[in-house]
């Protein structure tokens, strides 16, 4: 019984630390700025979400209920990320898309924070945190790119 307790304790420690062991290597991005430059460019909320991987509160974001035609760009570098054509009502309180505008413009990496494993979505040009992607979206992809409004800017179609 003592051995079983020891094995369970050891397994618990390994499981708890596994998030750190699985973190991705630091990436180099085309657009790089100092922390001070990011703070100067972004609002405090944008900085917290885009650069420190925060999350805006559900149903508070500017684009959660946006139904205008256009495209969504990265707040950090203006890279085109999503289109209103793939936006859908997910009921989550965040703008949701079933596909990026161009696959290579978003980067998906494992996020092992908060005691769970999720797929984080980042801008492939500047590394800004955009949100997460889940496998519960509509056809044709079955994906739900759940984005933070503060990580995006909207360009209305002409």
Per-segment meaning from a language model:
Residues 1-23:
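Bacterial Sec-dependent N-terminal signal peptides
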Residues 30, 39-45, 49-73, 79-158:
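A short Gly-Trp-Pro
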Residues 23-39:
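Short N-terminal segments immediately surrounding and downstream of signal-peptide cleavage
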């Amino acid at each position: 019984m003592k051995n079983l307790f020891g094995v369970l304790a050891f397994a618990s420690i390994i499981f708890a630390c596994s998030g750190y062991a699985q973190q991705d290597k630091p990436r180099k991005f085309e657009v790089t700025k100092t922390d001070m430059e990011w703070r100067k460019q972004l609002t405090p909320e944008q900085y917290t979400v885009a650069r420190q991987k925060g999350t805006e509160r559900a149903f508070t974001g500017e684009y959660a209920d946006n139904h205008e035609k256009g495209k969504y760009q990265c707040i950090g570098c203006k890279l085109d990320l999503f289109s209103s054509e793939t936006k859908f009502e997910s009921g989550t309180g965040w703008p949701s898309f079933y596909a990026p505008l161009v696959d290579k413009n978003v980067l998906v990496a494992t996020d092992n924070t908060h005691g769970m494993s999720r797929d984080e979505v980042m801008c492939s040009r500047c590394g800004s945190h955009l949100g997460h992607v889940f496998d519960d979206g509509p056809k044709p992809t079955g994906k739900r790119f759940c984005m933070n409004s503060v990580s995006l800017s909207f360009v209305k179609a002409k």
